[in-house]
């Protein structure tokens, strides 16, 4: 079952077409990858999905609801979470405090709608997420004191405090060493077992090929291939456009 569908999405910036009639589906409970060269349109597509960029044409649906013209905060209420390529954290706050802020924000709009999603307290939820992301021992450190690899986990933890059904991850392995990337992949696989769908943009092919159930490839704003990791790795057009430079 598709949790997210993108139908014929086109985005233009002046005379430049950033996305050209893009269509794809992200299956529920799976890890889907989006790869392609720099400037292919990957982040632009994530911005369209999350409501930060208006599409000139096309439609986006999430959990069966059309969200094409919805504000970003409304998409979050429909179960969409996101992390960014550039870290969006509070460096002067601790890891635990950064995560707590996200939970408090979620509780504010949930209480207004009389929709609590869960009867867990914020403290219980934070403890659970710290354990899941391996951040328990770093909880009292200020974000400015931890390495980038761990800061990426804090971004993920903050998103999880929103109780998302689908999380968009924009280059989550950036700044991580090989061990951190492997551990991050294991966390993503745990999340799918809990029913959370993952859609990630990533240049680290070791992460993409080890965790993704399905991969889409963008080049010059158009989808040039999609399939399993094995199919993508053996696709000549993909190799010529992108993977060849990674080998």
Where does each model-flagged region fall?
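Glycine-rich phosphate-binding loops of nucleotide-dependent enzymes
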Residues: 2-247
């Amino acid at each position: 079952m598709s949790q997210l569908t993108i139908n014929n999405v086109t985005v233009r910036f002046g005379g430049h077409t950033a996305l050209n009639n893009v269509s794809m589906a992200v299956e529920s409970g799976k890890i889907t990858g989006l790869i392609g060269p720099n400037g292919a349109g990957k982040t632009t597509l994530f911005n369209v999905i999350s409501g930060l960029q208006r599409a000139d044409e096309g439609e986006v649906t999430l959990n069966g609801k059309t969200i094409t013209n919805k504000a970003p905060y409304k998409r979050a209420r429909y179960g969409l979470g996101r992390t960014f390529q550039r870290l969006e954290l509070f460096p002067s706050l601790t890891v635990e405090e950064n995560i707590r802020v996200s939970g408090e924000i979620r509780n504010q709009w949930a209480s207004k709608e009389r929709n609590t999603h869960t009867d867990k307290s914020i403290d219980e939820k934070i403890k659970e997420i710290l354990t899941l992301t391996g951040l328990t021992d770093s909880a009292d450190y200020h974000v400015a004191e931890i390495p980038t690899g761990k800061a990426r986990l804090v971004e993920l933890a903050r998103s999880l405090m929103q109780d998302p059904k689908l999380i968009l991850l924009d280059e989550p392995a950036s700044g991580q060493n090989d061990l951190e990337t492997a551990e991050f992949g294991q966390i993503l696989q745990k999340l799918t077992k809990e029913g959370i769908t993952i859609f990630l943009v990533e240049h680290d092919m070791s992460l993409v090929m080890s965790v993704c159930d399905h991969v889409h490839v963008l080049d010059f704003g158009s989808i040039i291939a999609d399939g399993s990791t094995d199919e993508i790795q053996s696709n000549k057009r993909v190799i010529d456009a992108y993977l060849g430079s990674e080998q």
